[in-house]
C-alpha cells in the first residue's frame, strides 16, 4: 500500500488541497491519503479552532473520497504536546502501517522552511517527500538539487490566506473551497474581520 501523508493547518482547506490529493493519487500513485491537522510552529494561528479545522478537514476528506480515493483525517498532532513535529507524525504512521510505502506531501512554501523542521534526515528516513511547486515560480536550487525530493509542478491559484482574506471582506468563496467547506465557514462565521 502507498500511503500519502498530507499534514497542514487546513485553516481552511481549499481547492488547492483537494487538487494536491488528486495529483498524489495519479502521480505517486497513492492508494490512500492521511490528512493530518496540525499547528504550524513557524506561523501564528489564524482563526479557526482545532475542532473547526478538524471538521473542515473531514469535509475535505469526503470530497476526496467521492473521487474514489480513500482519505481519512487524524487529529493525532493536535493531541500531542505543542509544538508537534512532522517526524513524530511519520513515526506514529509508520508504527500503525509498518509495511506501507509512505510519501509526505509538502507544498513548496512549507518546504522552504524544511531545514528548520525538527530532524529533516529522520523525515527522509521514514518517508519519500513530494514537493508540490506552483507552476511559473522560479525553481529553487535547494529543491532542484535534492535527489531525495520529488518535485511535482502544480497550478492552484488559491491559498488559505486568500480564503481568509476573501471571507473577511465578504467576497464569495465559491470556486476557492469545496462547497461543503464554504457552507461550514459561513455557518460558523469563520474568518470575519474583527
Swiss-Prot record:
Entry coiled-coil feature ranges: none
Keywords: ATP-binding, NAD, Nucleotide-binding, Nucleotidyltransferase, Pyridine nucleotide biosynthesis, Transferase
Molecular functions per Gene Ontology: ATP binding; nicotinate-nucleotide adenylyltransferase activity
Domain of life of the native organism: Bacteria
GO biological process, one term: NAD biosynthetic process
Record-linked InterPro entries: Cyt_trans-like, NadD/NMNAT, Rossmann-like_a/b/a_fold
Pathway: Cofactor biosynthesis; NAD(+) biosynthesis; deamido-NAD(+) from nicotinate D-ribonucleotide: step 1/1
Disulfide-bond pairs as recorded: none
The reaction(s) this protein catalyses: nicotinate beta-D-ribonucleotide + ATP + H(+) = deamido-NAD(+) + diphosphate
Database matches in Pfam families: CTP_transf_like
EC annotation from Swiss-Prot or TrEMBL: 2.7.7.18
UniProt-listed NCBIfam families: cyt_tran_rel, nicotinate (nicotinamide) nucleotide adenylyltransferase
HAMAP family the record matches: NaMN_adenylyltr (MF_00244)
Main function: Catalyzes the reversible adenylation of nicotinate mononucleotide (NaMN) to nicotinic acid adenine dinucleotide (NaAD).
Family affiliation: Belongs to the NadD family.
Name by which UniProt lists this protein: Probable nicotinate-nucleotide adenylyltransferase
Gene this protein is translated from: nadD
Amino acid at each position: 500500500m502507498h500511503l500519502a501523508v498530507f499534514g497542514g493547518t487546513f485553516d481552511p482547506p481549499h481547492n488547492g488541497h483537494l487538487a494536491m490529493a488528486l495529483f498524489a493519487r495519479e502521480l505517486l500513485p497513492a492508494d490512500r491519503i492521511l490528512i493530518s491537522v496540525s499547528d504550524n510552529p513557524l506561523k501564528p494561528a489564524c482563526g479557526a479552532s482545532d475542532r473547526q479545522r478538524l471538521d473542515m478537514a473531514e469535509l475535505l476528506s469526503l470530497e476526496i473520497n467521492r473521487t474514489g480515493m480513500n482519505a481519512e483525517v487524524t487529529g493525532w498532532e493536535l493531541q500531542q504536546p505543542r509544538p508537534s513535529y512532522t517526524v513524530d507524525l511519520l513515526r506514529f504512521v509508520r508504527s500503525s502501517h509498518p509495511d506501507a510505502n509512505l510519501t509526505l506531501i509538502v507544498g513548496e512554501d512549507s518546504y522552504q522552511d524544511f531545514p528548520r523542521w525538527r530532524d529533516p534526515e529522520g523525515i527522509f528516513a521514514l518517508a519519500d517527500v513530494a514537493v508540490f511547486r506552483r507552476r511559473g515560480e522560479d525553481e529553487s536550487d535547494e529543491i532542484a538539487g535534492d535527489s531525495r525530493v520529488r518535485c511535482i509542478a502544480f497550478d492552484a491559484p488559491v491559498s488559505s490566506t486568500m480564503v481568509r482574506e476573501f471571507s473577511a471582506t465578504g467576497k464569495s468563496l465559491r470556486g476557492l473551497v469545496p462547497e461543503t467547506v464554504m457552507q461550514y465557514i459561513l455557518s460558523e462565521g469563520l474568518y470575519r474581520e474583527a
